[in-house]
């Protein structure tokens, strides 16, 4: 059985996401995998934070004779055990992990709430005289029919 280390496509339309997997060479791209070795997210804003690899497992599979695909070979070279971009990757992951400071919304919406509270109070008395007028008309109509 010839094993390859290649990417399995996940995600959705216009939002790709890949898993780096050890796969039998004869299986289709998104078919059954032997082991998942990491991820690759091309949509991540930080270039060096796009890839996560289990370096020890990648080394194991390469040691047993697995052949990486071209793109995976580049990722292993950069982010593998002795990768050239490991320090940049750690810094990028830290930048992504930080939460943005919370800024409270401006105070402008508060004055708008006060006039809204007065408006329903004005409408309520306007409805009451209309109800009284209808009750006054009813007895007058009965008196004329008699």
Curated annotation (Swiss-Prot):
Disulfide bonds: none annotated. It comes from the Bacteria. Residues 84-102 have a biased composition (Basic and acidic residues). Keywords: Ribonucleoprotein, Ribosomal protein. Residues 110-119, 131-146 have a biased composition (Low complexity). GO terms for biological process: translation. Pfam families: Ribosomal_S16. InterPro entries: Ribosomal_bS16, Ribosomal_bS16_dom_sf. One of its GO terms (cellular component) is cytoplasm. GO terms for molecular function: structural constituent of ribosome. The keyword Ribonucleoprotein applies. Signal peptide: none annotated. Residues 84-146 are annotated as: Disordered. Belongs to the bacterial ribosomal protein bS16 family. NCBIfam families: S16. This is Small ribosomal subunit protein bS16. The gene is rpsP.
């Amino acid at each position: 059985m010839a094993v390859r280390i290649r990417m399995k496509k996940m995600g959705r339309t216009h939002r790709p996401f890949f898993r780096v997997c050890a796969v039998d060479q004869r299986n289709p791209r998104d078919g059954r995998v032997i082991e998942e070795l990491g991820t690759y997210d091309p949509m991540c804003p930080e270039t060096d934070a796009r890839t996560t690899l289990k370096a020890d497992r990648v080394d194991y599979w390469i040691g047993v004779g697995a052949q990486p695909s071209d793109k995976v070979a580049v990722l292993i070279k950069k982010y593998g055990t002795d990768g050239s971009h490991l320090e940049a990757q750690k810094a990028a992951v830290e930048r992504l992990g930080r939460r943005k400071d919370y800024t409270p919304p401006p105070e402008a919406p508060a004055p708008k709430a006060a006039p809204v509270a007065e408006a329903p109070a004005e409408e309520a008395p306007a409805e009451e005289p209309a109800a009284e007028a209808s009750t006054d008309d009813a007895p007058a109509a009965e008196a004329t029919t008699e």
